A protein has these predicted regions:
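Non-catalytic pre-domain segments flanking phosphatase-related domains
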Residues: 1-35, 42-46, 50-64, 68
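C-terminal cap/substrate-recognition subdomain and adjoining C-terminal extension
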Residues: 2-13, 17, 23-30, 112-115, ...
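Preference for short coil/turn "hinge" residues that link or interrupt alpha-helices
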Residues: 33, 95-98, 172
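Residue-level preference for alpha-helix termini and adjacent loops
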Residues: 39, 101, 189-190
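Generic structural signal for well-ordered beta-strand positions
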Residues: 40-41, 197
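A generic alpha-helix surface/boundary motif
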Residues: 43, 92-93, 168, 208
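A metal-dependent, Asp-based hydrolase signature
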Residues: 44-45, 52-53, 57-136, 143
Length: 265
């Protein structure tokens, strides 16, 4: 029988299910966590977009159609376009646009911007407006999720973060917030001559593409012992997971989780 550790404070029913799954399985086991609004409160990529647009830092002026010679107008149009795409239900297009904001930067410059974003956001959760768009403010860890990650790690379960955000941004944030993960998979920028381009390696870690990423980067055949997400944009991974955990944000995923009797934390 596996030597199961029980010290972490998590939901007793969830803990029992984890122990049950560990006993059933053999060989290496893994769990997959979304990052934004799952491991942390709010979204590191959206926060970084706010920082970039506030400070007018975009370098690639070919990301939107039209005449983009007016720098102030371009930043306004970029952030408004992103949130309008989400509002219109064009999730894939919105997610693909926002991760292009690092186009024209070096990796080191992008990492610095993300770090400055985290420091400027602080931990007080609230909201503000930028260019008429309501923007979430503040970044902090989700303590219940971190306890769950630590419990899984304690029991030798590999923890992978699989996010639709820029892999660069998530890597900086996990390091800053000291989140213990074995692997980070996000949107992988194509870098040419040291400069980030507006193109990405496939498969894209967006919507159903998350499963393709899991099969390419984690396991071709095995499925997660546990999957955790905050939104129905991650439902493809949750559907493959033996234990399904939703972060309760009173959204569509919350309704699905309650209906299907998934765990909510």
């Amino acid at each position: 029988m596996p030597n199961i550790k029980k010290s972490q404070k998590i939901n007793p029913e969830l803990k029992a299910r984890i122990i049950e799954q560990i006993k059933k399985r053999s060989g290496p086991m893994f769990a997959i966590f979304d990052f934004d609004n799952t491991c942390i409160v709010n979204d590191i990529t959206e926060a970084t977009l706010t920082y970039i647009c506030k400070n007018r830092l975009l370098r690639d002026f070919s990301l939107l159609d039209g005449d983009n010679t007016d720098i102030d107008l371009y930043h306004k149009k970029f952030i408004q376009t992103y949130y309008q795409l989400l509002k219109d239900g064009k999730i894939f297009d919105g997610y693909l646009l926002i991760v292009k904001m690092f186009s024209g930067f070096t990796k080191k410059e992008a990492e610095h911007i993300v770090l400055q974003t985290i420091k400027s956001e602080g931990k007080n959760i609230g909201s503000s407006k930028l260019y008429g768009v309501k923007i979430a403010h503040g970044l902090k860890v989700q303590s219940n999720i971190i306890s769950l990650i630590n419990y899984l790690k304690l029991n030798k379960i590999k923890v992978h973060i699989l996010s639709a955000s820029s892999e660069i941004a998530v890597a900086v944030a996990t390091k800053y917030f000291k989140i213990d993960t074995d692997n980070i998979i996000g949107m992988k920028h194509i870098i040419k001559n040291g400069i980030i381009t507006s193109s990405f390696k496939k498969p894209y870690s967006i919507l159903g593409g998350k499963v393709d990423c899991m099969r390419k980067y984690i396991s071709r055949t095995k499925s997660p012992l546990l999957g955790a997400d905050d939104s129905n944009t991650g439902i493809s991974i949750l559907d493959t997971s033996s234990i399904k955990v939703g972060v309760n944000r009173n959204n569509e995923l919350t309704k699905i989780a309650k209906k299907r009797k998934w765990f909510l934390i």
